[in-house]
UniProtKB/Swiss-Prot annotation:
Bias (Low complexity) ranges: 90-105
Region (Disordered): 17-47, 77-105, 121-164
Bias type Acidic residues, positions: 136-149
Superkingdom, natural source: Eukaryota
Origin species: Homo sapiens (Human)
Protein name per its UniProtKB record: Uncharacterized protein C1orf232
């Protein structure tokens, strides 16, 4: 289809949606000064990185999103998000005692929680396939585990991933969900 067809179609659709008459549209076409130059200004959502990510992820499908979101619950969200500052100004520095308490009370990180939940679900799925009852594993205390690892290995902690969790595994699963959700062609 050519561009003129789409312009005509668009004007007809806009006309029916807005309720303008054809005479008003013809008058605007004849006198372009009546039509203000409408510059397409980008909305706030266009610059928001989360909305850009959401647009990219939308091809994953509902099933994949539900699978990923089932790994987390409201308690995790409350633990992972920092509490709002209680000072008069949001940029004001916290008192040292409050900052130290917040650092100590902080639980496992986002990816630590993700990895442990993922492993628990995989173990449960494997035991269901074998026909046995899944045994829930308690989450290890992250502070104790980190202290033990630091005592055992004084070298860099970033050398190995947490509890054998590989980033390649996560990316493989995401790609696998995307392929399953993609429409099948001829």
């Amino acid at each position: 289809m050519n561009q003129a067809f789409w312009k005509t179609y668009k004007s007809k659709v806009l006309q029916t949606l807005s309720g303008e008459s054809e005479e008003d549209l013809a008058e605007e076409r004849e006198n372009p000064a009546l039509v203000g130059s409408e510059t397409a200004e980008p909305t706030e959502e266009t610059f928001n990185p989360m909305s850009q990510l959401a647009r990219r992820v939308q091809g994953v499908g509902v099933k994949g999103w539900l699978t990923m979101s089932s790994l987390f619950n409201k308690e995790d969200e409350d633990k992972l998000l920092p509490s709002e500052p209680c000072a008069d100004h949001p940029l004001a520095a916290r008192p040292p005692s409050q900052a130290a308490a917040a650092a100590e009370a902080r639980g496992p990180g986002f990816w630590d929680a993700f990895a442990s939940r993922w492993q628990q679900q995989q173990a449960a799925a494997a035991s269901m396939l074998r026909g046995t009852e899944p045994t829930p594993e308690p989450d290890p205390e992250p502070a104790d585990e980190a202290a033990e690892e630091a005592a055992e290995r004084p070298e860099s902690q970033e050398a190995e991933p947490v509890a054998g969790f590989k980033w390649g595994f996560l990316t493989h699963k995401l790609a696998e969900m995307r392929v399953k959700a993609a429409p099948k062609g001829d």
